[in-house]
């Protein structure tokens, strides 16, 4: 234990001396660190040289530790904590929006009020009492050190997705915010806003205009939008305010020229993809966390925009070893850390180095203590088996042959299908009372046969799209039509104006009775041999010209779409002792947003073990990532999509994409669909870490599945091979 803190002291002092040229003056001015704060998935700890770790707070995940002249601020999943002395703590959440989660305890409803998930927290170096934070769809400003917060709106977008915020004095106070899709915006906040913490008042007044600041930022390929900015840093040094930005998914670092509103590129790496986040300033250097290492960028000479100015700290290995030692002493995943120099009196006399997003330093999917089912679900490779093909031995044998010859180890099969029908005979009478059995398989025989061939069995359960439950008890569970006062049915109108109903009927995602029905089905399927339960259509309806007429009668006050999904998953997690996976839209895995569906990967990853994005190339805009050579589009989508989703999820859940093993009559597929189309998707997943995938063909035709020797040995030459289709 006595060797632990000196390691940290050596790391920072040596690194600063080596990169800034300040040499012994650093040691004379600051001495060594007197303590280290560690934020984990479950709390905040203090480590000192002579004592065991001290638990300071144990209320939840610590995302960021911010030390200002005001005191110590801690960004958590319960909101914002504040202390002046690390001994006495208080919440500073007044005015921040609240989400309501529903729990069912011994058959009775209970409600938990939590601050909405906060994305970032920063203060104005010129006025530390001025602070800024953000939810997914609102920016909040404080002028009194976080004692109260006001909503100043969000960048002009109908889509949620705020990632980072900052506040600076730029001839008056200015708030900066990055949106995952639409880039960076700025808002002058010289006057105190009239809006309150109520989300309904989130619109800026006419005097408050969000100004786009995307000039100079690298665009997301084949789009008109800049790629996501992970963090914005306001760095005040020698009386000068400078603003820096770091992109999330590519090695790009910028400085903003406020006068010209232009981002100048400071550094560009060579990797197609590299996750990075947690940008801070320390002794005339920028520090940030990349995959596998802590990185420094010296500000002493920025005439070059290549890797010459990027210096991976020579003590990176020691830092990572120290973090691992901290995790041995504190057996919880480390999320953030703050190194504290000794100070006399207030924190303002200390020189802190605060690091966040430390999950990036760890190998993916190793938090088995926190989520034990991840180990079971990892590295599963398989296909979706249409349940009708499992009814007879002859048709099932075709898929056993595919399983064996293609060297796959997983089968996904419907047990509650898209029409709400049960494809097995339930033993629990509560299931039979709500569901309808239709052409069931012999469950015990099926499980026995497939396990004899080494199959990991996944039961697909369609959740909130359920025509059978929709019509039960006079529509008791249905999403309701507020105009017609009857169960809601989405429809569209064709060119002639004729109404055409969508082939979907939805039950209310807020209904705890629907949750219990799904949980009971899941429990029985696991008990009867399924290894994993996979939920599809775990979302709200998204289609229909009459979508605005939907009413959710089971909704309790304060709940929204996200809190309904989270409440459902919390309920399931407490009732099902097996790996849980969910299917999501490809766009919700690509961007940090739950737009349209309520599927926020960043939040959902805490509650499930596997997330399965449907990155089907046919379902994206046909020009999306179709830059030259266009044949590589399927590879790009799956390679980058898998890595992006892993980053958004912070590696808290396995990303196991569905691979498109079917042809769709759209422009790109008409020209390029062939065996290589499927193989390129697979190679994208494999090159993104190879943690698992599922082939999807809803009629069960898998002629295009690559042979094992092809998928294991195909290299760059395959990726660039012509499709031979004109």
Which role fits each region the language model picked out?
Residues 41-45, 77-81, 87, 137-140, ...:
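Loop/turn residues immediately N-terminal
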Residues 371-391, 464-524:
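Active-site-adjacent "subsite" loops/lids of carbohydrate-active enzymes
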Residues 406-440:
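Aromatic-lined carbohydrate-binding/catalytic grooves of carbohydrate-active enzymes
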């Amino acid at each position: 234990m006595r060797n632990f803190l000196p390691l940290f002291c050596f790391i920072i002092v040596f690194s600063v001396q080596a990169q800034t040229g300040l040499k012994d003056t650093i040691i004379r001015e600051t001495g060594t660190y007197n303590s280290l704060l560690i934020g984990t998935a479950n709390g905040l700890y203090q480590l000192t040289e002579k004592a065991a770790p001290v638990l300071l707070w144990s209320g939840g995940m610590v995302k960021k530790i911010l030390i200002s002249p005001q005191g110590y601020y801690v960004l958590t999943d319960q909101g914002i904590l504040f202390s002046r002395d690390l001994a006495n703590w208080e919440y500073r959440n007044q005015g921040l929006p609240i989400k309501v989660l529903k729990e069912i305890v011994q058959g009775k409803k209970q409600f938990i009020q939590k601050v909405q998930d906060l994305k970032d927290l920063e203060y104005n170096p010129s006025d530390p009492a001025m602070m800024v934070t953000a939810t997914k769809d609102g920016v909040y400003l404080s002028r009194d050190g976080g004692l109260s917060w006001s909503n100043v709106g969000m960048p002009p977008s109908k889509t949620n997705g705020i990632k980072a915020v900052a506040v600076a004095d730029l001839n008056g106070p200015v708030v900066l915010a990055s949106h995952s899709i639409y880039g960076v915006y700025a808002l002058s906040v010289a006057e105190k806003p009239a809006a309150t913490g109520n989300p309904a008042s989130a619109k800026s007044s006419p005097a408050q205009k969000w100004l786009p600041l995307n000039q100079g930022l690298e665009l997301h390929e084949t789009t008109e939008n800049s790629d996501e900015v992970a963090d914005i840093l306001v760095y005040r040094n020698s009386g000068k305010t400078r603003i820096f930005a770091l992109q999330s998914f590519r090695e790009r670092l910028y400085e903003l020229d406020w006068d010209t509103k232009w981002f100048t590129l400071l550094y560009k790496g060579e990797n197609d993809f590299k996750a990075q986040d947690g940008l801070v300033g320390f002794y005339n250097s920028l520090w940030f966390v990349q995959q596998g290492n802590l990185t420094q960028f010296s500000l002493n000479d920025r005439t070059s925009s290549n890797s010459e100015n990027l210096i991976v700290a020579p003590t990176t290995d020691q830092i990572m070893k120290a973090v691992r030692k901290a995790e041995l002493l504190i057996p919880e995943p480390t999320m953030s850390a703050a190194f504290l120099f000794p100070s006399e009196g207030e924190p303002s006399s200390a020189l802190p180095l605060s690091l966040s997003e430390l999950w990036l330093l760890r190998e993916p999917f190793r938090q088995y203590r926190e989520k034990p089912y991840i180990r079971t679900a990892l590295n599963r490779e398989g296909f979706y088996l249409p349940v009708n093909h499992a009814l007879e031995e002859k048709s099932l044998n075709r898929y056993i042959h595919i399983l064996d010859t293609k060297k796959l180890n997983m089968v996904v099969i419907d047990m509650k299908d898209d029409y709400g029908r049960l494809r097995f005979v339930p033993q629990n009478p509560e299931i039979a009372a709500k569901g309808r059995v239709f052409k069931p398989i012999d469950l015990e025989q099926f499980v026995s046969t497939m396990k004899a061939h080494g199959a990991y069995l996944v039961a697909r359960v369609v959740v909130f799209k359920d025509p059978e439950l929709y019509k039960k008890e006079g529509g008791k569970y249905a999403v309701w039509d507020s105009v017609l006062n009857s169960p809601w049915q989405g429809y569209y109108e064709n060119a002639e104006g004729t109404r055409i109903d969508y082939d979907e009927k939805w039950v209310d995602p807020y209904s705890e009775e629907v949750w219990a029905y799904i949980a009971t089905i899941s429990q029985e399927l696991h008990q009867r041999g399924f290894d994993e339960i996979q939920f599809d259509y775990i979302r709200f309806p998204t289609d229909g010209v009459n979508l605005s007429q939907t009413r959710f009668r089971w909704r309790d006050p304060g709940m929204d779409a996200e809190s309904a999904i989270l409440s459902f998953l919390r309920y399931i997690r407490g009732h099902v002792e097996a790996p849980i996976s969910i299917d999501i839209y490809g766009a919700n895995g690509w961007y940090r947003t739950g737009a349209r569906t309520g599927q926020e990967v960043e939040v959902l990853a805490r509650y499930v073990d596997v997330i399965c994005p449907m990155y089907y190339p046919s379902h994206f805009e046909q020009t999306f990532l179709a830059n030259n050579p266009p044949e590589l589009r399927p590879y790009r989508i799956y390679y980058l999509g898998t890595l992006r989703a892993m980053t958004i999820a912070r590696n808290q859940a396995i990303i196991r994409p569905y691979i498109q093993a079917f042809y769709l009559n759209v422009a790109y597929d008409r020209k390029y669909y062939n065996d290589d189309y499927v193989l390129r998707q697979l190679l994208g997943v494999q090159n993104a870490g190879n943690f698992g995938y599922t082939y999807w063909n809803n009629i069960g035709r898998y002629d295009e599945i690559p042979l094992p020797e092809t998928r294991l040995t195909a290299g760059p030459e395959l990726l660039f091979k012509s499709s031979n289709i004109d």
